[in-house]
Amino acid sequence: MIQKNKNFATAKAKSIRVSPRKLNLVASFIRNMKVSEALVQLTFSPKRIAKIVKDCLQSAIANAENNLGLDIDRLIITKATVGKSVVMKRIMPRAKGRATRINKFFSNLYITVTEKEDN
């Protein structure tokens, strides 16, 4: 069943093994971009996390096309938000019998694509 009253689709990627600060660099880069241009930029980005962001964006495009029947040539990325997820705590042995804590951060990514109206 295709709903035509909504003109936006979302996708999310949860518990990504990267800090929110690093993920936000890529998310802010693609915000307010056409999806075709964003896919090209993410394909050739040197950032390690760009592949996961690209997969999430392709999921949002597929949701827009298959669930809502939107035209993928007119889609733009309206929201690309990053949130904190769990923090995995680890121990690193140090000198003289001491130990320090290592925090391994995880992130959540939410992408919303909207069909641009013709004016």
Swiss-Prot record:
The protein's superkingdom reads: Bacteria
What Pfam families does the record point to?
Ribosomal_L22
Mind telling me which residue stretches traverse the membrane in this protein? none
Q: Which SUPFAM superfamilies match?
A: Ribosomal protein L22
Q: Which UniProt keywords apply?
A: Ribonucleoprotein, Ribosomal protein, RNA-binding, rRNA-binding
What biological processes does GO assign it? Answer: translation
- Any one GO CC term of the record: cytosolic large ribosomal subunit
Instruction: Describe the family membership recorded for this protein in Swiss-Prot or TrEMBL.
Output: Belongs to the universal ribosomal protein uL22 family.
Q: Which NCBIfam families match?
A: rplV_bact
How is the quaternary structure described?
A: Part of the 50S ribosomal subunit.
Identification of the protein by name: Large ribosomal subunit protein uL22
Query: What is this protein's gene name?
Result: rplV
